[in-house]
């Protein structure tokens, strides 16, 4: 061992004091104590080599040198070529011969012997030297970085009252209970961040607030931060001073002060911590509270981003309604809403009695539709997004009451805008003595003897699929047909319609009309080539439709035909005794066509080639609501005849298309 091989040099306190007083060129004094002991007090101009287990092991393994352990301020002395005297001391060692071989001081001395010519140990250590020569001892602050070594609040505060802002003070329980100190600083509001600290007697209840939390790693201080900031602002608005305190003014109250600086001054959590730390160095929020400050910082950033983008994204655009002279576009209701709306419309039209010359009733769905429009306008959906949505599923809702009120009905509908939402379809169910021509109603303001043809819609190109958001659907019946109000989409009967082999009369009975069956290869949906020239495609659910000539199954027959349509995708059909069998439908149509007149044929041809006039207001509300939902994209790139055959096989209907009796 080095201690056994050569006796250690020793130096007493007096000799070291004389060398230190001699000025520059004195010995290199090394302090082998811990950093905490060295930081509190040490010999003048001494260098600390921390006696830790890590440093000891690295010295034994030769992974660190003495020059690397000595601070850079004294490294020039180590690298000097002239001989250097070294004095090593610990806390209280008097005899180096009694040191253990594996002690830190023994290992350090052996390493110093290999670097320096003269290495001595101070007799009695720092305890003896500091008692004899306190003037040659000094203490300096810790060279720690500006970070928090989290620890619980100390029972006794290290400093007194601290002023953070002109109206905000940070202190401890002792400071708050000192009435003279509080009066001297003009503090009249107290924010107590503890469970145990009492309320001062000289502070009224209205100026006192308690946050019942403890200083541990489980408490939630974040929910209390906004209330605390409001309380501090209340004192500021009253031109008073407020003190935030806990037991020692180190952790809980410091966290609240940091949060207040973050909120009011717009600082980050790090900057706010340094702001408070510079004014009260003793603060040390625990890691739990520091993490909650980071969460609070994120919430403040999110709030600031929302406030910045609020005028552009948060607030909806001003809506253009009837007051501005522009009607709001309507959206199709769901299947259940459409059926319910149609039932309510029929009931209201049957039971209500509007005054003659008065306006039509306001649709009941207007408030809900307006609220939905406001929500959708706030979303700022682009036209491309709307088109993508329309391609997935297209819903046609034939809600006449909500879509064609006289106050909202446009006189000249133009071509649909691809960026608009899907429009509601029109179901023409005319009443009166002629097909497609509504009879004037006494309670309708538009009751005039003559009729005006409605401008037809332009058919989209054949290459593009049927994507028009507005479609027309017509249900046309004979002269003696009546319309009886019914609810929903249930099976309907037509007591006024003549059956096969029965004369048409008001007292004749006809079996109930069945819904058209699902298209099949034996009885598919038939497409009329007239649709290419007319306003839209004409469909027949019961038989083939000829190109406009009267005959069996044609829409021009008196009681057995069915037809109508427009807008590129609507159609309807109805027969005297309806059946999914096309042969029975044809025979029924043939017997009915024999009693038709040529004038009736001409009128019905005119109806097929043009749009009928808008029906009266009372007839509108008696119509039925029918909704068809189908998937599109299956008919692209096929011939028109093949399109309808594929459509009959692949299209799924959410509700059955019923033949509706009219009055």
Curated annotation (Swiss-Prot):
The residues covered by the Rhodanese domain are 23-138
Tissue specificity note: Expressed predominantly in brain and lung.
Q: Where is this region: Disordered?
A: 313-367, 404-624
Per its record, what are the GO molecular function terms? MAP kinase tyrosine/serine/threonine phosphatase activity; phosphatase activity; protein serine/threonine phosphatase activity; protein tyrosine phosphatase activity
Q: Where is the active site?
A: 246
Annotated Gene Ontology cellular components are: cytoplasm; nucleus
Q: Which family does it belong to?
A: Belongs to the protein-tyrosine phosphatase family. Non-receptor class dual specificity subfamily.
Q: What is the protein named?
A: Dual specificity protein phosphatase 8
The source organism is Mus musculus (Mouse)
